[in-house]
């Protein structure tokens, strides 16, 4: 069965657009595992709009019409983003470089090349990643022998690496991925709770959210990151914590992830999950995802928006 990708674009609408003429094109190339969905009520520039997503398993172009309406429907209760690879494609030229600079400054004679780091990303968490690597290839001569002291050694490396990484973020050398700010704005405007759930250090995640999304958005976004839970992805602990803290039903949450381990965590938490592939995860297995795209996208190259997220929940409830 052929599949196509759809995108519901509200960003190009203007306040002067008439309710009968508001229309946007869909950009076909991949379709998620979704069924035709009911209209979704959104607010745009003071107007109540009704987006009617039409999902087809075909390679032909399709369209969607948005019209002013008072019809009520259900949007996600919460929109949960992973950080690295979703908000920003940080891994290859961000975290990897910062790890290597840390190793160099500590004179450890360790370098993670692009391919090796891609393999290490299958392990959730930077401290866990370093520990697994050293356990496999051998610990540096400068590392302590005692297990407890090794944990402190790894924690020190990770703290130094985080500080180097934050410099990259604060200098805005790593941009937001296309469509992230748009989707966050749509959620916040329509009363959908927004959170970032990441295995990365909390300071690094907060820096990304504050510096790249801006302080006004950041103060409305809840962050769950680092060691806030004892187990990292693919364990669902961080998504379970997010749902509990936000006071939302996991089945009414939509997660945006970029990796197979992130997808596994979201699904284990009972949540709907959209995957936006990143540089390191393009070839991973996303068979269990509710939708898969190359990115969120900004108009006119938009892939999906908040209305589409709602359509996936509707499909879940009627299936």
Curated annotation (Swiss-Prot):
The cellular component terms of Gene Ontology attached to this UniProt record, alphabetical and capped at eight, are: chloroplast; chloroplast envelope; chloroplast stroma; cytosol
Q: Where in the cell is it found?
A: Plastid, Chloroplast
Tell me the enzyme class: hydrolase
> Changing residue 129 to A does what?
97% decreased catalytic activity with xylulose-1,5-bisphosphate, but no effect on activity with ribulose-1,5-bisphosphate
Where do the catalytic residues lie? Answer: 82, 84
What EC numbers are recorded for this enzyme? Answer: 3.1.3.-
Q: Which reaction does it catalyse?
A: D-xylulose 1,5-bisphosphate + H2O = D-xylulose 5-phosphate + phosphate
Where does the record say the transit peptide is?
1-65
Pfam assignment, any one: Hydrolase
**Which of this chain's residues are annotated to bind substrate?**
82, 91, 125-129, 158-161, 198-204
Binding-site list for Mg(2+): 82, 84, 258
Tell me the function of this protein: Highly selective xylulose-1,5-bisphosphate (XuBP) phosphatase. Also shows activity towards ribulose-1,5-bisphosphate (RuBP) and fructose-1,6-bisphosphate (FBP), but not towards fructose-6-phosphate (F6P) or ribulose-5-phosphate (Ru5P). Degrades xylulose-1,5-bisphosphate, a potent inhibitor of rubisco produced by the rubisco itself.
Q: What is this protein called?
A: CBBY-like protein
